[in-house]
Regions:
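Metallo-beta-lactamase
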Residues: 2-18, 73, 77-88, 106-176, 236, 259-274, ...
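Conserved beta-strand hairpin/beta-sheet module of binuclear metal-dependent hydrolase folds
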Residues: 16-70, 157-182
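Pre-active-site segment of Zn-dependent metallo-hydrolases
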Residues: 10-15, 38-81, 92-97, 150-154, ...
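Active-site metal-binding loops of divalent metal-dependent hydrolases
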Residues: 44-46, 85, 145-148, 182-184, ...
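Structural motif
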Residues: 38-40, 78-79, 103, 140, ...
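Cap/insert and terminal regions of metallo-dependent hydrolase folds
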Residues: 63, 103, 109-112, 185-272
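Short hydrophobic/aromatic-enriched beta-strand-loop microsegments
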Residues: 42-43, 103-106, 120-128, 200-206
Length: 286
């Protein structure tokens, strides 16, 4: 059953730009999304090169890159969308420096862990449940989509993970749909996404081919191409690659696989700190 809750954010703006939005790639799966005066941060990780995060069961991963900015350099945030509670998606810097009053939309498991750490506005979403966000004139909906962090025999040892669909609304335009895959592998439940949402404008693909004890737990190049074939986004941006030493499938592997599949015109690549701007399509006149 699909359920929806309402989140109303305080606003001081009298008017907002509801025609365009932007995504700035901070690094790993951390992206700064802006639309209509709403500022969203995804999967916040801000440790630096050579520093480590815990990935559970006494295992650690070392960062190979630096984030494009520090938490103190971010603009004022309205909310966080967190795919799951792993150290390379919510690290010790985020826990220490993020405002504890920020709403965090995430899995039920992650919300419980965050609330224990003082993030009292953590908002759990079950799969297919949504939160409608309002700030001034801006309207958007965040829906939790299926995700599975590993193969069936290993999934019970891994945290629950969700994909996210962000739908940005404007009275004069069609909704813009942004799909963030989260740290999922391809599995049958994902087939329901294109049935419910056949028109995805942009996808952020969590890649990297992460392997823990030899087990694949995030999409590699081949699975990334499979995701493109499944959800058929108009455009896609790869993220979550080359940033940690547990990532075994480099971006170059994905680029080669995308070219071989003939999807190169749909891909847009961002370096750390670079920004992608999107525009809502105007509705056809009646």
């Amino acid at each position: 059953m699909k359920t929806e809750t309402l989140l109303i954010l305080p606003s001081k703006e009298r008017s907002a730009n509801l025609e365009t939005g932007s995504l700035q790639f901070i690094g790993n799966a951390t992206v700064l999304i802006r639309f209509g005066g709403v500022t969203i941060l995804t999967d916040p990780t801000f440790i630096h090169r050579h520093e480590r995060v815990s990935i559970g069961y006494g295992l650690h991963s070392t960062r190979l890159t630096d984030p494009a900015m520090e938490i103190g350099e971010l603009p004022p945030l309205d909310l966080v969308v967190l795919s799951h509670f792993h150290g390379d998606h919510f690290d010790q810097v985020a826990e220490r420096e993020l405002d504890k009053s920020l709403p965090i939309v995430t899995t039920r498991e992650a919300a419980t862990a965050l609330q224990r750490r003082g993030f009292r506005q953590s908002k759990p979403l079950d799969t297919w449940a949504s939160v409608a966000v309002e700030k001034g004139e801006a309207r958007l909906r965040i829906t939790a989509l299926p995700g599975r962090h590993g193969p069936p025999f290993a999934d019970l040892l891994l945290p629950d993970v969700m994909g996210s669909l962000l739908e940005f609304h404007s009275p004069q335009a069609q909704p813009f749909r942004l799909y963030i895959t989260g740290d999922t592998l391809l599995f049958d439940d994902l087939k329901e996404i294109p049935r419910r949402y056949p028109a995805i404008d942009l996808a952020l693909l969590h890649l990297g081919g992460t392997r823990v004890l030899g087990i694949l737990v995030t999409m590699d190049a081949e699975q990334g191409v499979g995701m493109m074939k499944l959800v058929r986004p108009l455009r896609a941006i790869p993220i979550h690659y080359n940033d940690y030493d547990v990532f075994k499938s480099p971006l170059t592997d994905f680029q080669q696989a995308i070219d071989a599949a003939g999807f190169q015109d749909r891909l847009h690549y961002l370096r750390h700190g670079e920004t992608y701007t999107f525009r809502l399509s105007r509705q056809a006149a009646a």
